[in-house]
C-alpha cells in the first residue's frame, strides 16, 4: 500500500512530498491548494505520492470523494462514455465530475488526442471554478508538454513540484526501505550503483 509513511524522501523530492501531504491535509478546505502538478522522469515516485494522497483521504477523510486514474484509464473511460452517449444522450464521465478530488497520472499520454485534451480542459476548468481539487502527474513540466495553451495555463496556475533524480545516498535509503534491514548494508551497497532512475 502506498502511503506517506513508507515514501522515502530527501532533498530531491521533499517539495513534492510535503506538497502532496499538505494537499491531502487541506483537501476539505475550499479554495486552498486547488491544484498540484508533480513532474519528473519515470520511476522516481510520482505515482507513489498520488496514491498516497488517495489512500490518506480514504483512511482519514472517507467523506471526500476521490477519483484516481492513470491517463490510459481516462482515455478508455472517455471513449466508452462517448459511445454510450450516442445511444442514450446521457451526461458522461459522472465518475469524474461527481468527485471532490480528481487525481490523474501520466497526463503526457493524452498529448495529440484532441478530443481527450479538450475534454480534460473542460473537466479541470469545472473543478477549479467549483473549488474542487485536482492532482496531476507527468514526466515533464507543463511548459514542455506541448499541450493546448489553455490547459498549460491551468497546470501552471497551481503548485508545480519537480521530483529530481535521486542521489547515491537517496538510492541507498530507498534500497534500505525495501530490503531486509539485517541484510541492507551488504546488499544495498552492492546494488545501489545499478539503480539509476529507481
Where are these regions (language model features)?
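Short glycine-rich substrate-engagement loop in P-loop NTPases that contacts/grips substrate
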Residues: 58, 63-101
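Structural recognition of the conserved hydrophobic beta-strand(s) that form the central parallel beta-sheet
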Residues: 68-69, 103-105, 133-139
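Walker A/P-loop nucleotide-binding motif
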Residues: 28-51
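Conserved AAA+ ATPase "SRH/arginine-finger" region at the nucleotide-binding site
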Residues: 158-171
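Pre-Walker A (pre-P-loop) alpha-helix and adjacent loop at the N terminus of AAA/AAA+ ATPase modules
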Residues: 2-35
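Sensor-1/coupling segment of RecA-like P-loop NTPase cores
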Residues: 122-149
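Conserved AAA+ ATPase "sensor/coupling" helix adjacent to the nucleotide-binding pocket
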Residues: 158, 173-185
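Short regulatory helix/loop adjacent to the ATP-binding pocket of P-loop NTPases
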Residues: 81-84, 142-157
Amino acid at each position: 500500500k502506498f502511503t506517506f509513511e513508507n515514501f522515502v524522501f530527501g532533498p530531491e523530492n521533499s517539495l513534492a512530498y510535503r506538497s502532496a501531504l499538505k494537499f491531502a491535509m487541506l483537501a476539505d478546505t475550499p479554495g486552498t491548494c486547488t491544484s498540484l502538478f508533480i513532474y519528473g522522469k519515470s520511476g522516481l515516485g510520482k505515482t507513489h505520492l498520488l496514491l498516497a494522497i488517495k489512500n490518506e483521504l480514504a483512511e482519514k477523510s472517507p467523506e471526500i470523494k476521490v477519483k484516481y486514474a492513470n491517463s490510459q484509464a481516462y482515455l478508455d473511460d472517455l471513449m466508452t462514455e462517448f459511445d454510450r452517449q450516442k445511444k442514450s444522450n446521457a451526461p458522461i464521465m459522472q465518475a469524474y465530475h461527481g468527485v471532490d478530488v480528481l487525481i490523474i497520472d501520466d497526463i503526457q499520454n493524452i498529448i495529440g488526442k484532441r478530443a481527450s485534451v479538450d475534454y480534460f480542459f473542460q473537466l479541470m476548468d469545472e473543478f477549479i471554478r467549483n473549488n474542487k481539487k485536482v492532482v496531476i502527474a507527468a514526466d515533464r513540466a507543463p511548459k514542455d508538454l506541448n499541450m493546448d495553451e489553455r490547459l498549460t495555463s491551468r497546470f501552471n496556475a497551481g503548485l508545480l513540484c519537480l521530483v529530481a533524480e535521486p542521489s547515491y545516498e537517496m538510492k541507498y535509503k530507498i534500497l534500505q526501505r525495501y530490503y531486509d534491514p539485517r541484510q541492507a548494508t551488504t546488499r544495498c551497497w552492492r546494488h545501489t550503483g545499478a539503480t539509476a532512475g529507481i
